[in-house]
Amino acid sequence: NYRKYFKVVRHCLEKEGTFLLHTIGVEESTTSTDPWVEKYIFPNGMMPSSRQITGAIEGLFKIDDWHNFGPHYDKTIMCWHKNFTKHYQSLKHNYDERFFRMWTYWLLLSAASFRSRSNHLWQILLSQPGSNNLTSAFR
């Protein structure tokens, strides 16, 4: 489905248009996801590898920039966890203990996956091969 997705993106872009892909990625290519994540967090979700992305865009786009924010994303998720646990008491009347445990588990698991660098948060700037638009990527 990655190739089909990028073909649609290209079709929607103007000739000089650029596309920023913001995605969580993994080191190893896979065609399945964790059953728990599939059921409770991201139904039909999939994290692509760099190889799957580059294979899907070949001939459709050129890569202008590829940045990995993964090492910093651990801190973001830990802030979400802190806020979630801090404010859960005010949410308790709408969400049960199971909900609290599931989201605590998910946030801590996610933070660990970025801390260990098994997951990455990528922003990939793409342009069409014939484009003369030299977009600057700011860091």
Predicted segments with their positions:
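Substrate-binding/catalytic lobe of Class I Rossmann-like enzymes that use SAM or dcSAM, i.e.
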Residues: G25-L134, F138-R139
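Alpha/beta-hydrolase-fold catalytic nucleophile elbow
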Residues: H22
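Proteins with a high burden of low-complexity, intrinsically disordered sequence enriched in S/T/G/P/A and R
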Residues: N1-Y2, S50
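A short glycine-rich, Lys/Arg-flanked "PGG" loop and its adjoining helix->strand segment in the class I
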Residues: R3-T18
